[in-house]
Regions:
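Helix-enriched interaction subdomains in cytosolic or periplasmic regions
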Residues: 1-11, 104-108
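Adenosine-phosphate binding glycine-rich loop
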Residues: 2, 9, 15-21, 25, ...
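Short, flexible coil/linker segments at domain boundaries that flank nucleotide/cofactor-interacting
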Residues: 28-32, 155-156
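Short beta-strand elements in bilobed, periplasmic/extracellular small-molecule ligand-binding domains
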Residues: 35, 57-72, 185-187
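Glycine-rich phosphate/diphosphate-binding loop of Rossmann-like nucleotide-binding domains
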Residues: 40-55, 135-253, 263-273
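Short, well-structured alpha-helical segments in soluble
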Residues: 77-89
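Anion-binding alpha/beta catalytic cores of soluble intermediary-metabolism enzymes, centered on
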Residues: 95-157, 198
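Short glycine-rich anion-binding loops that position phosphate/pyrophosphate groups of nucleotides
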Residues: 96-103, 211-213, 237-240, 288-289
Length: 326
């Protein structure tokens, strides 16, 4: 039986339509949420990511600013820029694109961002808000995973949920979100024992470990006795360039193998592609979780604008123009 495909692109379009309505309603009150992105250096992947985020802002009607400090920037210089953005009433969200150059203390820079403008949801204050189940800004990828589950009618309360990965960016916040939704949550990592058996008990599996095809198809709970198979959320986006590895992972997908031969690479998730024949529902790679990350960044920017104004935290006063804006 082929799994039901959990299409992240479709859900992105639904949420974008909802956000456009929210943004239009805010505009009637003279409010236009805005996102400031900070990109250091010439990393092609980072440039592409930021370009996509700015394009999403333009599509939705959000204000956006791109700040491009030079590669040789210091930690202190970055902290001054963040302080300027924290004080700017027009800026509702601040995005620091990672990685930063080696000479910059990324932890200090990220933690200098006002929690009220931390639209990535990485600040310790926002993590604490999530732990205590209070309104705040949640890390974008886990928030997107929850939207996929909820909008596809996946039952969360009482479900056995397994999260593979314990990173601060995905694994830990994902586990907390599932816990707050009344799932019974198990978090696994590199030291976990009997991993296949743990995964086989999962009604919901979230894989976020960064290893192509690590979760085997026969680890996934199949449909049985009228109950659906596991819902699988595959966060991994791994570029496979080795022909033998591609052949092993894509042996049952001749069209994808043909594309690999033409391009020299293929994107594969953390779950073996053959799981499409075992799982009850499955996010594709690409086209599953990926589109949701930028979507939730946009959602967080709108949410930050509303939360800050409701709390009277519209800013600390207008500052001098932020550095390197363009």
């Amino acid at each position: 039986m082929t799994a039901r495909i959990l299409d992240g692109t479709k859900i992105r379009d639904e949420i974008f339509a909802e956000l456009k309505e929210e943004i239009a309603a805010l505009a009637e009150w003279g409010l236009r949420p805005g996102l400031a992105a900070v990109l250091v250096g010439e990393n092609p992947a980072s440039q592409l990511y930021v370009k996509s985020k700015i394009a999403a802002c333009e599509q939705l009607g959000l204000a956006s600013w791109l700040h491009t400090p030079p590669t040789g920037v210091t930690t202190e210089w970055m902290l001054e820029l963040v302080d300027d953005l924290n004080r700017d009433d027009n800026v509702d969200g601040i995005l620091i694109q990672l990685p930063l150059p080696a000479q910059v203390d990324a932890k200090r820079v990220l933690e200098a961002v006002s929690p009220a403008k931390d639209v990535d949801g990485f600040h310790p204050v926002n993590m604490g808000m999530l732990v205590s189940n209070r309104p705040g800004l949640v890390a974008c990828t886990p928030a997107g995973c929850m939207e996929i589950l909820r909008r596809n009618g996946i039952a969360l309360a009482g479900a056995n949920a397994v999260v593979l990965g314990r990173s601060d960016i995905v694994g830990k916040p994902m586990a907390l979100l599932l816990l707050h939704a009344n799932a019974t949550v198990t978090v696994c990592h590199s030291k976990s024992r009997d991993l296949p058996e743990i995964v086989r008990r999962a009604d919901i599996l979230v894989a976020a470990i960064g290893r192509a095809g690590f979760v085997q198809a026969d680890w996934i709970k199949p449909a049985a006795a009228g109950k659906p198979g596991a819902a699988v959320i595959d966060v991994g986006t791994n570029k496979v360039t080795d022909a033998s590895e591609a052949g092993r992972l894509l042996a049952n997908f001749p069209a994808r193998l043909e594309r690999f031969a033409a391009k020299g690479n293929a994107l594969v998730g953390d779950v073996h592609p053959d799981a499409v024949n075992t799982a009850g529902a499955l996010t594709p790679v690409p086209g599953g979780v990926g589109p949701m990350t930028i979507t939730m960044l946009m959602s967080n920017t709108v949410k930050a604008a509303k939360l800050r104004r409701a709390a009277g935290l519209s800013g600390e006063g207008r500052s001098k123009p932020a550095r390197t804006a363009r």
